[in-house]
Amino acid sequence: MKLYNLKDHNEQVSFAQAVTQGLGKNQGLFFPHDLPEFSLTEIDEMLKLDFVTRSAKILSAFIGDEIPQEILEERVRAAFAFPAPVANVESDVGCLELFHGPTLAFKDFGGRFMAQMLTHIAGDKPVTILTATSGDTGAAVAHAFYGLPNVKVVILYPRGKISPLQEKLFCTLGGNIETVAIDGDFDACQALVKQAFDDEELKVALGLNSANSINISRLLAQICYYFEAVAQLPQEARNQLVVSVPSGNFGDLTAGLLAKSLGLPVKHFIAATNVNDTVPRFLHDGQWSPKATQATLSNAMDVSQPNNWPRVEELFRRKIWQLKELGYAAVDDETTQQTMRELKELGYTSEPHAAVAYRALRDQLHPGEYGLFLGTAHPAKFKESVEAILGETLDLPKELAERADLPLLSHNLPADFAALRKLMMNHQ
């Protein structure tokens, strides 16, 4: 597999290099040189396969012979050890539930596949994973790499800005997992990660790698569950499918669009954000004008500078698709709460991120179409807000209950690169 740097097309790397480096020169994102396509017949045959076999086939179309098919399938089996069911919400709407993994969030798919790829590629060489999280990435990455040999993980998150339960899920592990609470917002955490990757000495000394959705292995893994969703739908739904994606860093939407590029029958995608609406405003008036990030109920989408957006634009350019074909919506907290109550009346308990996606979908779905929205996290991960909004008590899944009373093992740091650098060098 060959990939190129979106900021410098002359920088071309293999899949192994892209996974290991994370980012290219000048913080450029890597993008596949070849965009494989399956025929309609091939797609129909693939949709009959089981999740793991089909996923290995999809991933192999990108990765090629860099990783033998047998090993790839084995690694996919280890990564995707849980289902991605479509729950029936209304006669014309389903929710693709991506929260049945160990940390109850969609990022388990990408995090675990990346961990499998990195450990396969690195062999015995030590690696340090440095990533920023607004919640779910931290937990997924921590659990995906926890206890794996030759890997150290450093996770930055905005202090006081993620739910207490989310914090417990990844800040209580210890071992090879180091968690750092930063005085600042998610964008401040992202900025520190970028500074670290610009520091050549630090990069080489620690074998730095990033594990957020910019890593190509995570992005490729996310393509697979779109196929799994379609495989569960009846033929008439497949023919008129509209997918609404709750969007923060836009990795999930990028993966969905790559699935469509492979030949998956999706009529239309909707990018659903909260009031951090840089992309909806851009799609509306063509002006890219990020505003200060605002805290919302759907906190994993509190991102005003989505770092996967260049990949979306590149895919549209390569496929000669029109950006105006992409649906969009920005949903405020009041509407999010109202939507969660509406979903509850339909018999479906949801959380803020999925509610944003459902609202955008319901408002834009036409008669005869089938709508799918992504459920990216278990409602219990947002227990306090969900209970307050719905006026009922949620049972804690065992994954959360087991960690609820454990002590936090995080360091507190200012949003200052020198302080972070010192901590990382001291904790090699």
List PLM regions with ranges.
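PLP-dependent amino-acid enzyme catalytic core
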Residues: 1-428
